[in-house]
């Protein structure tokens, strides 16, 4: 797993945002105007001092939409809740998994080919943040 910290940008570059919803089915004429401009940093990074990026590897989270090579935006200031996708270390080994707190603590892969990782009272589990966004290339 590769970790990256966001760096200070010299210039904020707001990008055009078209509020028109783009149908995924039959094409329809689109509106020809920009409603506003958005800055991806503002959209993706709520807590700059506690946000970092991780490059995912493997296929254990494909059913959660995380593929090999995707860039994950992680907020380390958020408390991890039941059902969150987290960056965790169990016995010092990093992983990205869905956190299950009830009825027992487990790290759940989102791929039926993998088994959940039970976390017992004798195990060391560290949570390094909650995944807030997935950035992926589509071509």
From Swiss-Prot:
Sites marked Cleavage: 24-25
Keywords: Autocatalytic cleavage, DNA damage, DNA repair, Hydrolase, Protease, Serine protease, SOS mutagenesis, SOS response
Enzyme class: hydrolase
Gene Ontology terms: cellular component: protein-DNA complex
Top-level taxon of origin: Bacteria
SUPFAM superfamilies for this protein: LexA/Signal peptidase (SSF51306)
Example GO biological process: negative regulation of DNA-templated transcription
Disulfide bonds: none
Function noted in UniProt: Involved in UV protection and mutation. Essential for induced (or SOS) mutagenesis. May modify the DNA replication machinery to allow bypass synthesis across a damaged template.
Family: Belongs to the peptidase S24 family.
Descriptive protein name: Protein UmuD
Gene: umuD
């Amino acid at each position: 797993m590769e970790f990256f910290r966001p760096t200070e940008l010299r210039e904020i570059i707001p990008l055009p945002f078209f509020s028109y919803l783009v149908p995924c089915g039959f094409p329809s004429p689109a509106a020809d105007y920009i409603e506003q401009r958005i800055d991806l940093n503002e959209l993706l990074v709520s807590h700059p001092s506690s946000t970092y990026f991780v490059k995912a590897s493997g296929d254990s989270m494909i059913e959660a939409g995380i593929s090999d090579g995707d860039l994950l935006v992680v907020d380390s200031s958020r408390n991890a809740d039941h059902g969150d996708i987290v960056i965790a270390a169990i016995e010092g080994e990093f992983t990205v998994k869905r956190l299950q707190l009830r009825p027992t603590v487990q790290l759940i892969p989102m791929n039926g080919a993998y088994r959940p990782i039970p976390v017992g009272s004798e195990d060391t589990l560290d949570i390094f943040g909650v995944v807030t966004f997935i950035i992926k290339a589509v071509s």
